[in-house]
Each structure stands twice: as C-alpha cells, then as structure tokens.
A protein has these predicted regions:
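Amide-donor transfer/coupling interface in amidating biosynthetic enzymes
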Residues: 474-476, 481, 524-525, 557-697
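Short acidic/polar capping segments at secondary-structure boundaries
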Residues: 8-9, 32, 275, 353, ...
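Short, well-ordered, mixed-charge alpha-helical segments that flank or form enzyme active sites
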Residues: 34-35, 231-233, 254, 542-546, ...
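Active-site glycine-centered loops adjacent to acidic/histidine catalytic or metal-binding residues
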Residues: 307, 538, 668
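Glycine/proline-enriched, intrinsically flexible loops and inter-domain linkers
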Residues: 1-500, 513-524, 650, 655-656, ...
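Short, basic, glycine/proline-bearing loop/turn elements
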Residues: 197, 278, 503-512, 628-629, ...
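Cysteine-nucleophile active-site neighborhood
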Residues: 498-586
Length: 697
C-alpha cells in the first residue's frame, strides 16, 4: 500500500506501523519540480514531465461498426413443463453453488445480515450481500447492500441488451432485499475479446457502453467506478461480451428481508416488468413497481422477495421454497413467464391478510397462488405435483462433483449424555470489571468481534499485537504479553489463520509463543493461583489443543495419543451456521444457559474435526469436559453434514479443561448482534462472554 504522509509525520507514521507489526519505508518524495524521477541503484532511470503524464498518452482513434442484434434467440418454445422444470434446475447458471460459497467466510466481522443461503435448511439462495456497517464501539443500525447482474447468453446475442439488463438485474436484486433503487450507485466491470483494429470487435464494447448508459439514464442512477479488461482472447478462443454490473446501496438493517418463503397461506404475486418492442423495459412502470415494493417491505406486507433470473419464475419458486420447505400452489403463468428471461420482474410473498388488488393497483402484476404446508410445487393447469426434495436433488446435482456439499453418511447414532454437575468456585478476589487480554497474532482476524463481545458484557479489554518483524520486536512482544496476562483475569485467543496455518496445521505459531517459559508461567499462574479463565475460539481452540490446555488444563508436551483438531472430513473450508447443544454445565462459561439448550453459531474453518482415542473420549464424557455438540434440526447429536460441518467424533464442537475454566470451541460465539442472520431462524446468544465476566463478580 502506498500512503502519502505530511513530512512532519513520517517518523510518527513509521512508528505506528511498527506497533501494528507492519514495515513502513519511505520510497518517494513529493517535489515542486513538476517532474517524475525514478532511481535504481543510485542511477536515474526515469525523468518525465508532469505535464506529459497529465495528457494520459496520445489520443487514439478507431472505426466502430455496431451490428444490429438478430431475432431474439432465447424465447421459450413448446415444452413439457414438468421435464423442463427439473432440467431448468440443472442448468449451470441456475444450479446450486453452495459448495463453492461455503469456502468463503460469510460471517467474518460479525456484521452479516443475510447468510448466502437462508431458511432452516440453509437452501434458499439470497439476492444480495447485506452487512452492517462496522463500528468499533456501539451497535450499527445501517447496512450496506451489494448485488450483481450479468447474463452471458444475452451478451452473445446483443452486447447492448446484455449491459442494459446487467444493470437492471443488479438493481432488481437490491430492491428485492429492501433497498431503495433511487439511492443506488453502480460500478461496472467489463471483459471483452482482444479488439485489435477490427471495427466489428470494437462495436461490441461500444454497444455495451450505450446499453449501460441507457439503463443509468432510465433509472437516474450513475456508475461511479469500474474496471476494464480487454484481454479476453487466447488463441482462437474469445470470451463472450461481458459487462458485470454491481449495485450498491444502504438501508436500515431492520428493514432487510430475505428470499426464502416464511409462512403457510401467504399470497404469491408476480410483479412484472413489461418490455418494449426493442426488448428494453417500459421503464416508468418498472420504477413504479420498485417504489411500491419498497413501500410494502417497509410496511411489513411483503415478507420475502426474489428477482426473476436466468431460469425464469420456475427457478425462483423452487429456490424460495427450498429454505424452509414451504410448498407452493400456483396458476396463471405462461410457459414464457415460467422459463423465459424476465429481468426486472419479481416474485413476492405477501402476508395473507393483504388485499393484493388494492395494494398493487396501477402496477403490472398477477396474483399467482399461495404457499402450502406440503413440501410440493403444484399447478393443476400443467398437471404438476413436484416434491421439493426431488427438485433440490436436481438443483444440487450439476456442481456437486466439483464443489462437494456432502460426505458419506456414517449411519450411526450417538447417545446423548448430559452433565449437570459444577465444581467451579467463585474467585477469592472479586472484580467488578474483569480485564481481558486479547493477543493478536499474524493472521488473527477476529479480535474486533471478540473485543466487542466482551465490551458488551461490561469487561475491560486490551488487545496486544504480537510483533515478529524483527528479533527485538519479538522479544519485546513476549515481555508485553507476559505483563498483560499477569494484569488480566481472562485470556481470549480469537480466531483467524495464525501464520497462515503453516507449517502443516493451524495454531502452531500461537502454541509456540505460549510455550515460551515467561508466557507459560504467567498463564499457569492465572489459571492455578488467580482463578482466571481462558477462552479459545476456532484458531484459538486449535492452539489450546496443541498446548494441552484443553483437555488437560496444563501446557504439556504433545503425544501421539492426544486429542487434536484436523482437516474437515469434506477436505475444504466450511463457512455456515450450525446448531450446537449445551451438554455440560461444568464450565463457568456456560453458567448463563440451561443444560440441553440449543444455539445457532457461525462456523468458519478448514481444520475443525475433533478426533481423539476412544479411551480419552470416554474420559471426557465422564468428566463432563465435552461442553457442546453439533445437533440436527431435531436436536439429535449429528455426525454427518450438513449438521456436523467437519465430521467431529461424537459431534464434539467444544471441550473444557478438567476444572471447566479453560474452554475451546470451533463456533464463533462472538459473531452476534442485532439484526444479524435474519434469514436463519434460531437463538444465537450463548451468553458465553457475560457468563465469563459474571464469574468474577
């Protein structure tokens, strides 16, 4: 990163960088010579006038030939609706991408308003990425919305319409979650074949530019950023004309809605974007639709919405139904509406007591049916009676071999064992506001979330960036960490990827630091002599395991027969919301919940599978050291995906030391807050942080 700093502040800036474990050096100076001079090994190699650079190079001229698009090639013919419904879900641009999406941490920062897939079964694809604006203190109420739009088939037919509808699709998606299209700003990313001097090739980005411009003028919203890539050719291969539109907006987090169907007996409405003869939208009607939609979302009358995309209304009805397994009975839709491209149109779930004709008066719409309790999609007109499970299998099939979403079921059950004894005595010395030390190692990325969680629990927090850019910095960090541990009552090891999870396994860097004699002595003094607590989440749990603090309560040498956390059974990173059950009350960290309570918790890890010898597992169960286990939607201990995200033995998610005061767990209990995960039903607050603080009072 290049930063311009006032010359009086250079030394201060470099010192502040060192505090953050960053190297900063002066690489250039701003002068009044109006020339750019660059040196290599003391020799001047560049000397250019600023006025020359300001010209942005020589002016270039080319000929452009725009070909008119031919007959619209994407019309729906005479098809068998039942067969097409299933085949439609198998299309590459319709099929589930869940196995790909789960590879990316969707809850980092603790501000996620909508998970990528919603509903109790996490199966309904969402319209947009929505996250609260991050703040260091307090609770943010504002959320950002980001959506995208692009259809490659349209690009092959007409670059003009492709760019036009990329913007329409992105804006419609943003409106579907509760955003106001009038406040949208756009950024565009283009990608075209190598143009050379061919006028027809130049005509493709030119036409796309005109289409994008028309959409912006029609909607009154500008693109304020973008990126171009003009290298989409390799040998005889060319990319299709591509302009991907990204729409960005803001809205109160409380106003955001999601795509999965919510209630039985809701009304379903098809809000239609009508087209002109040239295949552009009748824009005034489209804008009126979006304004009405925004109004009804704010009034709580529209409770879910999804824009029509590549696979038409048939795609949307299926996907909206998957998340909560709520069925649909529909009618009054043509084959073109079911399977054709109807960008700008939406399917809405409307509360059962809403007068649809009155609310949508003046809009282009159809009342198309209602939701039902049975897990089916039914239409008498087309003799349809499709089971949601069968449709979901078709939806997941296309990419399942490339991006796996399941492992082989073990077909085993685990007997639930609840441990209700507690041997925790309150500390001899009470503390009104206990201090929490949160060391931040290279690769740690959850310190802000953990600090916020403890502050909300009314604790004093101190973050310490562990610096390793030099030997002196390393030694100083050891001394500072020791000092902070001795002044604190709680040690918090947050999640992340310490030292990039290398070499060969996560948490090794943290465990190496904590094996330093000064740190080791301070930790054991805290735990054994001062009745302190320690918590490790995700990467922090991995470090606790490697140290032996869980399950042994001591920093010990690693032996082959010890417990460990290893690679997820699916052999990739997993990010999702799972459910865990509290099965032991031994730890003070769980004093605020009841035995058997089930909570939702965010997980994001590649090495979270708990494994241990059978003898040790038996001891942990008997001693009440197994604190939490993964469970399914019925509350049963889960051994298989998706409920057990990593394949942990006995479904173990969290364990404690023998006395319960050291807790390690994979789930990110700190990633909670108001209006988060609005599309995933359940209780997210395990009260871990307030329980830890209350222990000292």
């Amino acid at each position: 990163m290049a930063v311009v700093v006032n010359k009086e502040n250079v030394d201060r800036f470099i010192e502040l960088s060192k505090v953050e474990n960053l190297e900063a050096v002066v690489v250039a100076e701003v002068t009044d010579t109006e020339r750019l001079r660059m040196y290599w090994r003391g020799k001047e190699i560049v000397n250019l006038k600023r006025s020359f650079l300001d010209t942005n190079g020589a002016r270039q001229i080319t000929n452009v030939e725009v070909k008119l698009p031919g007959e619209y090639p994407l019309a729906v013919g005479d098809i068998n609706v039942k067969e097409e419904w299933i085949n439609n879900l198998k299309k590459l641009n319709v099929a589930s991408q869940k196995g790909l999406v789960e590879r990316f941490d969707s809850t980092i920062g603790g501000g996620t308003v909508l998970m990528p897939y919603g509903g109790k079964d996490a199966a309904t694809e969402q319209e947009a990425m929505v996250a609260k604006i991050p703040v260091l203190n307090g609770e943010s109420k504002e959320a950002t919305i980001m959506s995208y739009g692009f259809n490659p088939d349209l690009g092959v037919w007409s670059p003009y319409h492709m760019a036009y509808y990329s913007i329409i699709e992105a804006v419609t998606k943003l409106a579907a979650v509760g955003g106001d299209y009038r406040k949208v700003r756009l950024t565009l990313q283009e990608y075209f074949e190598k143009l050379g001097k061919n006028p027809e090739r130049w005509g493709k980005p030119f036409a796309a530019l005109l289409g994008a411009y028309q959409a912006q003028m029609d909607l009154g919203i500008p693109a304020i950023g973008g990126k171009d890539s003009m290298s989409g050719s390799f040998g005889s291969l060319d990319v299709p004309p591509t302009l991907v539109a990204f729409a960005v907006g803001v809205e109160k987090a409380k106003n955001i809605i999601s795509a999965e169907l919510k209630e039985v007996a809701s009304k379903l409405v098809f809000l239609m974007a009508e087209r002109n003869e040239d295949y552009t939208l009748k824009v005034e009607g489209y804008k009126k639709n979006l304004e009405k939609l925004h109004e009804l979302i704010l009034e709580g009358k529209v409770i879910s919405a999804s824009s029509v995309k590549f696979g038409g209304v048939a795609e949307i009805l299926s996907k909206m139904a998957f998340g909560n397994k709520i069925g649909v009975k529909f009618s009054n839709l043509t084959k073109e509406e079911l399977f054709g491209l109807n960008y700008g149109s939406l399917v809405l779930e409307v509360k059962s007591d809403v007068n649809v004709d009155e609310e949508f008066k003046g809009c282009a719409y159809k009342a198309i049916g209602y939701t039902v309790e049975d897990e089916v999609i039914v239409c008498e007109e087309y003799d349809l009676d499709l089971k949601l499970n069968a449709l979901e299998e078709a939806y997941e099939e296309k990419l399942s071999k490339v991006f796996k979403i399941k492992t082989t079921d073990k077909n085993q059950t685990v007997k639930e064992v609840l441990y209700n004894e507690s041997n925790i005595k309150s500390p001899v010395i009470k503390v009104a506001k206990p201090k929490v030390i949160i060391p931040v190692f290279p690769g740690t990325n959850c310190e802000y979330d953990c600090e916020r969680a403890f502050r909300n629990a009314v604790a004093e927090t101190e973050t310490l960036v562990f610096r390793n850019y030099s030997n002196d910095a390393f030694v100083e960090s050891i001394k500072n960490l020791e000092k902070q541990i001795r002044e604190s009552q709680i040690i918090m090891l947050p999640g992340g990827f310490s030292a990039g999870d290398e070499p060969d396994g996560s948490g090794k860097f943290i465990s190496t630091v904590f094996r330093n004699e000064r740190i080791k002595d301070a930790v054991m003094d805290l735990l054994k002599n001062r009745d302190g607590l320690m918590l490790g989440i995700c990467n922090g749990f991995q470090a606790l395991i490697k140290l032996g603090l869980v399950p042994y309560g001591e920093i010990v040498d690693i032996e082959e027969d010890m417990a460990t956390l290893t690679y997820n059974e699916i052999n990739r990173h997993m990010s999702s919301i799972i459910q865990t059950k509290v099965v032991s009350k031994k730890s003070p960290w769980f004093s605020g919940v009841e035995l058997g309570d089930i909570h939702n918790v965010a997980i994001s890890h590649g090495e979270g599978r708990f494994v241990a010898p059978e003898k040790l597992l038996k001891q942990l169960i008997e001693n009440g050291q197994v604190a939490t286990q993964y469970v399914d939607n019925k509350g049963n201990i889960a051994l298989d995906m998706p409920f057990n995200p990593n394949g942990s033995m006995l479904g173990i998610e969290g364990i404690t030391s023998p006395d319960g005061r050291v807790l390690g767990k994979m789930g990110h209990s700190e990633r909670i807050g108001d209006n988060l995960y609005k599309n995933v039903p359940g209780n997210f607050d395990q009260k871990i942080f307030e329980s830890g603080v209350r222990y000292f009072k």
